[in-house]
Amino acid sequence: MAPSVRARFAPSPTGDLHLGGARTALFNYLFARHHGGRLLLRIEDTDRQRSRREHEERILEDLGWLGLRFDEGPYRQSERGEVYAGYAGRLLEGGLAYEAEDASGRRAVYFRPPERGGAFRDALRGEVRFGGVRDFVILKSDGMPAYNFAAVVDDIEMEITHVIRGEEHLPNTGRQALLYRALGVPEPEFLHLGLILGPDGRKLSKRHGAQSVRGYREEGYLPEALLNYLALLGWTHPEGREEFSGLEELVAEWDPSRLGSSPARFDPQRLLYFNARHLRRLPARRLARLVEPFLEEPLPPGREEVAVEAVREELRLLSDAPRLLGRLLGPVDPGAAAGRPPGGAGEALAAASRLLESRRPEGLEEARELLAALRRWAKERGIKAREALHPLRVALTGEDRGPRLEYIIVLLGPEEAQKRIERAREARLRA
């Protein structure tokens, strides 16, 4: 019986979680869940100068925001010194390691590989050959393990069956394969994801607009949109699907055989497109809750869902909400309606004012009934519906187009809507 899948995500707490790391975490998550296996979180914090606990905390927060849950961990390499020392001792006893001065003149433990090259198998690339491996440090002079040694020891101890990571680790994998063989332990299955490139074909960086996961979160991206887009950077659905509602659907649709080794190109506009699509699918209650932190003033009490429905179609980011809602709730220039449109605008505004006064709509259905009554009024007088509704829109918002009028009326409330209509009528009389 084949061993159950055990995968891991192993970030270094030297900064925030970036897109490449988030994709690696996602693909490990999908792989483990697809196979009914377990996913471990390991913090590779052996770099004492650069590793910070606050970075670790931020990485954990961002993984939680993405919805990526782990079955074990976090394990911290900085807390496992005795384990690494024990494995180094085995290599020393077997003549496969030795102590010598490092570049700083202090004593360190070096691995002496029995072979200077060889090959390992990659799930996407097949056989990968390597060579020219020199003796390298496995225990640094401060007692901390070097990256390649710690990774191998931990993957052995944690019974990792599959190592899924970025292509940039291919040079490390050759060294790690030699360590596995020296320790007499079978290697896990390796799978190296293709690089993520910018739109110009160069390695992805901040100059392409790429940010940390936290940066996207603070800008107003949804976790499900970011996950959706990241899943497509190196993977294709068998039927060409590109939109997925969230992790649960991605797990259900995941097919590891559709992973590719070619570089993927990051397109900021494509990510923005996915975010807008996911925003449109959100339930109004959740959307209102997510929008609130981006606003200086709270949404109108009792009309929170109407407010977000009013701007939903124009939202691309949660951070767009203040600007879009400000156009509706902010002050309107009374002169905006003066002189446009010509014809019976003043008469139409008077009719709208009377209807508001008599009906005082509080809900969407009542607002729709008011607008239907205004259309009937226009039809009885041989006026096109648009010629009656457009002056009302301009009076309420100062703009020629925008959200559906029923949302605007309910969002403003009958009193404010009435005031805006009266100010527009007065402005027309003065024009």
UniProtKB/Swiss-Prot annotation:
It comes from the Bacteria. The keyword NADP does not apply. One of its GO terms (molecular function) is tRNA binding. Its EC number is 6.1.1.17. ATP binds at K206. It is an enzyme of class 6 (ligase). It catalyses: tRNA(Glu) + L-glutamate + ATP = L-glutamyl-tRNA(Glu) + AMP + diphosphate. A motif ('KMSKS' region) lies at residues 203-207. InterPro entries: aa-tRNA-synth_I_cd-bd, aa-tRNA-synth_I_codon-bd_sub2, aa-tRNA-synth_I_CS, aa_tRNA-synth_I_cd-bd_sf, Glu-tRNA-ligase_bac/mito, Glu/Gln-tRNA-synth, Glu/Gln-tRNA-synth_Ib_cat-dom, GluQ/Sye. A motif ('HIGH' region) lies at residues 11-21. GO terms for biological process: glutamyl-tRNA aminoacylation. GO terms for cellular component: cytosol. The keyword Cytoplasm applies. Its main location: cytoplasm. It is found in: Cytoplasm. Keywords: Aminoacyl-tRNA synthetase, ATP-binding, Cytoplasm, Ligase, Nucleotide-binding, Protein biosynthesis. Belongs to the class-I aminoacyl-tRNA synthetase family. Glutamate--tRNA ligase type 1 subfamily. Catalyzes the attachment of glutamate to tRNA(Glu) in a two-step reaction: glutamate is first activated by ATP to form Glu-AMP and then transferred to the acceptor end of tRNA(Glu). Monomer. PANTHER family: GLUTAMATE--TRNA LIGASE, GLUTAMATE--TRNA LIGASE, MITOCHONDRIAL-RELATED. This is Glutamate--tRNA ligase 1.
